[in-house]
């Protein structure tokens, strides 16, 4: 091969700065290699050895070698020419660019880089430069990744360095790690439980994790020290954050909704294993086609099929049978006359039906949009193939123990309307197996397996496996699936239903055949056939429900009571006081009446008293006999053991029955040993008063005006409209409302007013209210006092002291006497009468002075001619204070001869005659002028009966 041929370029190739060589095309390599002789092959080996030589030689030595190679001539060129076909990867050189340029020039000079056209040389140089840059970039990336890995390893060692302890490694090698080695120390970060809104735990964990990443990016190297965030399904309403300090958590959670940062607690180190311990979740993994039930809204309890799950597994798209009314219940705005959709409540929701576009088009066309033949949008919701397609949150769905009924599965049939019978049978089988509940002691039979037909007793129960001790085997109990067991009952056993429509019903077993048990119900006296696994042995023959039992007396309304004749789980059959049988729900029953505290009694046809518990018999007709359950106003409830219909309960009028035996009479007829023992009788003390007899017939409180004394309506007035036992129905005056109040918490009034009385007082008075107190009405009656003068105000009825009527006598003092001389304080010349017959008026002074109230002369008294306190007065003859003022003759207590208490004044005309005698006067020096004297002057006393004293209040003659 010539030197020229060897120097010609074969293909695009070059040598990079770091020594990497790019190979030529494969076809040219084969052709060139075929021309290489043995001498050239040896040169290739020498070149390989030279390429692997030490790269740390000095530059001077390299230059000397280059000069020697130049002197060798063609031999050197051929050897370097062969290097064109070898891909030699050299180590990365860290020399400066000057050294790299020198090496390039040497390679060109030695023939490693062929000489071609100038364009080719430029292309080779540009390609080498690009390749060098790319390789340098790759090296930088690799270096940075190695640094990141080392940094991450360092962080892990710092955080979990405690796991590298010798004790932990030694324990791990043995296959057992003590729990104390797994507990964090006091130097590690603490876990805080932060309160949050229930149901938002998972959303908040994701939101906080995203916030953590954003803060780390924005803060650079100074990152927020939040180590972990998690939540547990078993601890609702809390999320857990691992951080070294409490302030870090407060800063981190600040501003995040649904988190209550102030309500947090530190989790003790001892409780961390329990907090992080994995537990079996009750949630079922949802897949397209799974059945779920909706927990809330108008579709609460409805079956739905999962169509699609969201990426975050928080929401899913469901296919639901819609409940639409197509705008029938919409409200119309009176202002705009536009329809407004009314929010449908759960109780008023329409029945489930597939979407009907024809009905929607006719009833509510404005809200209907057609997407395609099977896809419609109605009121912003999509309907495909008649089903509602809507997105629901998984937390509002029930995913476990979903057992669809045949009716529900029929709604989700195939496109042609057919129902998958296989799916239905499997669903029913699973539902029956899940409802089968076994208890220790139940006698069971094995249905499948090697022990098929064997019988035994249940010893232990679990969710799916039941431990059974087989009869006749002394071996330990064996475990069997729930589906392979069946309960065993014998005719005569008393059983009760555990679940289903007849839950709570009980009865006596009649027939057992093929796992089905037929028993007679204690409630309806009918035969019922129930699966054996849905029954359990019952010791109580009285069927009960959660709230009400058989033969309970319940209140349906304020005026209607009934007796329970069939008790279900939520539905009850009752017999009301009119004898009508009806079915009611638990919500329609107001309350249960406690018959043990009821004191209502009735009267039978013979006039005897009937109470609860007495035995009665009908006087006419079928002469049914039974025990009194409850006494109503005009009806009584009786239960008989000889009657099957209505659980033995019937209603009759108390007048159509007669008492056979009274429970109280039987108790009273028994011997009282306590009274026979004198020591016990002495300790008991004197006998107490007998209780008030219970009223019979119409209650005394009916139609009485009452005031309520209990809380809620305290102080309000009303009328008693009905009485039922101890409760009274009161119609309030303030508003048209009837309320039920204890009749002993009412105060009873007369309709005319007056003081109120209690119910016990009303019973003792036999319903008669005390009359209102009659007397002067100081509000409406005229204030003018009755007088004896014509035209005076009419007198009111008396009875009081002093009297107000001149027709009533015998008062003290006497009122209303006629006569001139015997004018009473209120009689004779009235206070408002004519001329003054007496002396100077109370208000009048000297003659000529006109009285305050007018008159003919100035001497006219303010209170009339015969002044109130004048000389014809009850108390004396002269004016109250004086006639002329010169002496005491006109004194209040004396002066005139007609004084009520004596002739001379108390203070004496000249000061001589005493009111009680003893002092001398100018008439009787011996002092016989006393009020009680016997002289003619003294006979004019108020107690005398002489003519001079006839004007006295107590005198007899005129």
Swiss-Prot record:
From the Swiss-Prot or TrEMBL record, state where the protein is found: Nucleus
Keyword Transcription in the entry? The reply is: yes
> Which InterPro entries does the protein's record reference?
KOW (IPR005824), KOW_Spt5_1 (IPR041973), KOW_Spt5_2 (IPR041975), KOW_Spt5_3 (IPR041976), KOW_Spt5_4 (IPR041977), KOW_Spt5_5 (IPR041978), NGN-domain (IPR005100), NGN-like_dom (IPR006645)
Region of interest called Disordered, as start-end residue ranges on this chain? 1-131, 825-891, 911-958
* Primary location class: nucleus
Q: Which GO terms describe its cellular component?
A: DSIF complex; rDNA heterochromatin
Q: Where is the composition biased (Basic and acidic residues)?
A: 32-44
Q: Name one Pfam family in it.
A: KOW4_SPT5
- GO terms for biological process? intracellular mRNA localization; negative regulation of transcription elongation by RNA polymerase I; positive regulation of autophagy; positive regulation of transcription elongation by RNA polymerase I; positive regulation of transcription elongation by RNA polymerase II; regulation of rRNA processing; regulation of transcription-coupled nucleotide-excision repair; spliceosomal complex assembly
Annotated disulfide bonds:
none
Give the Gene Ontology MF terms in alphabetical order. chromatin-protein adaptor activity; DNA binding; histone binding; mRNA binding; RNA polymerase I core binding; RNA polymerase I general transcription initiation factor binding; RNA polymerase II complex binding; rRNA binding
Subunit field text: Component of the SPT4-SPT5 complex. Interacts with RNA polymerase II.
Family per similarity comment: Belongs to the SPT5 family.
Task: Report what the protein is called.
Answer: Transcription elongation factor SPT5
């Amino acid at each position: 091969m010539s030197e020229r041929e060897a120097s010609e370029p074969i293909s695009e190739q070059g040598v990079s700065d770091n020594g990497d060589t790019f190979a030529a095309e494969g076809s040219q390599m084969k052709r060139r290699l075929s021309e290489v002789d043995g001498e050239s092959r040896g040169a290739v080996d020498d070149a390989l050895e030279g390429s692997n030589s030490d790269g740390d030689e000095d530059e001077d030595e390299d230059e000397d070698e280059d000069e020697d190679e130049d002197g060798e001539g063609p031999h050197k060129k051929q050897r370097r020419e062969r290097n064109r076909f070898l891909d030699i990867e050299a180590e990365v050189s860290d020399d400066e660019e000057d050294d790299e340029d020198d090496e390039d020039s040497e390679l060109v000079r030695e023939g490693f880089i062929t000489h071609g056209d100038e364009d080719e040389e430029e292309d080779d140089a540009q390609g080498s430069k690009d390749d060098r840059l790319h390789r340098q970039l790759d090296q930088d990336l690799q270096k940075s990744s190695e640094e990141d890995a080392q940094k991450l390893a360092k962080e892990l060692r710092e955080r979990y360095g405690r796991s590298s302890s010798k004790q932990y490694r030694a324990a791990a090698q043995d296959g057992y790690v003590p729990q104390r080695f797994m507990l964090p120390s006091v130097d590690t970060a603490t876990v805080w439980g932060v309160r949050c809104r229930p149901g938002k735990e998972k959303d908040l964990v994701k939101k906080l994790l995203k916030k953590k990443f954003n803060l780390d990016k924005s803060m650079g190297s100074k990152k927020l020290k939040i180590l972990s965030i998690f939540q547990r399904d078993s601890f609702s309403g809390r999320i857990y954050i691992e951080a070294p300090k409490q302030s870090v958590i407060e800063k981190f959670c600040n501003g995040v909704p649904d988190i209550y940062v102030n309500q947090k607690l530190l989790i003790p180190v001892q409780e961390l294993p329990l907090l992080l311990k994995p537990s079996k979740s009750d949630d079922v993994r949802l897949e397209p086609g799974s059945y779920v039930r909706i927990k809330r809204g108008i579709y609460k309890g409805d079956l739905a099929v999962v169509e699609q799950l969201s990426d975050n597994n928080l929401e899913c798209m469901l296919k639901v049978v819609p409940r639409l009314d197509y705008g029938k219940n919409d409200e119309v705005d009176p202002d705009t006359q536009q329809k407004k959709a009314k929010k449908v409540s759960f109780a008023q929701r329409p029945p489930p039906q597939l979407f009907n576009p024809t009905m929607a088009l006719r009833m509510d066309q404005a809200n209907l949009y057609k997407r395609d033949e099977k896809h419609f949008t109605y009121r912003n919701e999509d309907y495909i193939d008649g089903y509602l397609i809507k997105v629901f949150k998984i937390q509002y769905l029930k995913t476990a123990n979903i057992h669809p009924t045949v009716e529900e599965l029929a709604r989700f049939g195939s496109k042609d309307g057919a129902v998958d019978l296989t799916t239905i049978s499997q669903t029913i089988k699973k539902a029956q197996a899940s409802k089968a509940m076994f208890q220790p002691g139940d006698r069971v039979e094995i249905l499948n397996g090697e022990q098929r037909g064997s019988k035994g007793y249940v010893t232990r129960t679990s969710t799916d496996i039941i431990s059974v001790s087989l009869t006749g085997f002394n071996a330990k109990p064996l475990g069997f699936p729930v589906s392979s067991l069946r309960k065993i009952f014998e005719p005569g056993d008393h059983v009760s239903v555990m679940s289903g429509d007849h839950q709570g019903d009980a009865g006596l077993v009649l027939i057992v055949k093929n796992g089905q048990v037929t028993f007679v119900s204690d409630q309806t006296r009918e035969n019922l056939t129930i699966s054996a696994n849905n029954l359990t042995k019952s010791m109580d023959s009285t069927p009960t429900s959660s709230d009400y039992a058989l033969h309970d007396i319940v209140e349906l309304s304020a005026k209607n009571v009934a007796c329970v004749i069939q008790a279900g789980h939520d539905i009850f059959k009752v017999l009301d006081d009119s004898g009508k049988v009806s079915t009611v729900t638990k919500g329609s029953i107001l309350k249960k009446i406690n018959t043990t505290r009821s004191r209502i009694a009735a009267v039978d046809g013979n006039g005897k008293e009937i109470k609860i518990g007495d035995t009665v018999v009908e006087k006419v007709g079928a002469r049914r006999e039974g025990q009194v359950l409850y006494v109503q106003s005009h009806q009584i409830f009786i239960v008989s053991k000889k009657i099957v219909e209505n659980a033995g309960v019937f209603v009759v009028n108390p007048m159509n029955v007669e008492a056979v035996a009274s429970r109280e009479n039987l108790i009273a007829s028994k011997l009282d040993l306590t009274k026979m023992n004198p020591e016990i009788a002495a300790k008991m003390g004197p006998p107490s008063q007998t209780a008030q007899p219970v009223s019979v017939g119409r209650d005394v409180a009916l139609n009485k005006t009452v005031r309520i004394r209990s809380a809620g309506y305290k102080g309000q007035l009303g009328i008693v409209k009905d009485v039922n036992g101890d409760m009274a129905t009161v119609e309030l005056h303030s508003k048209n409302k009837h309320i039920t109040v204890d009749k002993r918490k009412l105060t009873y009034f007369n309709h005319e007013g007056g003081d109120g009385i209690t119910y016990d007082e009303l019973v003792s008075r036999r319903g008669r209210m005390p009359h209102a107190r009659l007397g002067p009405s100081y509000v409406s009656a005229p204030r003018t006092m009755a007088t004896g003068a014509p035209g005076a105000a009419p007198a009111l009825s008396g009875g009081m002291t002093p009297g107000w009527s001149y027709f009533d006598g015998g008062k003290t003092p006497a009122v209303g006497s006629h006569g001139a001389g015997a004018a009473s304080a209120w009689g004779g010349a009235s206070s408002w009468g004519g001329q003054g017959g007496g002396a100077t008026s109370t208000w009048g002074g000297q003659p000529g002075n006109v009285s305050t109230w007018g008159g003919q002369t100035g001497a006219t008294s303010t209170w009339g001619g015969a002044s109130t306190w004048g000389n014809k007065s009850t108390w004396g003859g002269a004016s109250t204070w004086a006639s002329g003022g010169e002496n005491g003759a006109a004194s209040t207590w004396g002066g005139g001869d007609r004084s009520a208490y004596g002739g001379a004044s108390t203070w004496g005309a000249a000061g001589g005659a005493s009111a009680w005698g003893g002092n001398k006067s100018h008439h009787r020096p011996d002092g016989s002028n006393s009020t009680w004297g016997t002289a003619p002057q003294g006979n004019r006393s108020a107690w005398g009966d002489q003519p001079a004293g006839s004007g006295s209040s107590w005198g007899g003659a005129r």
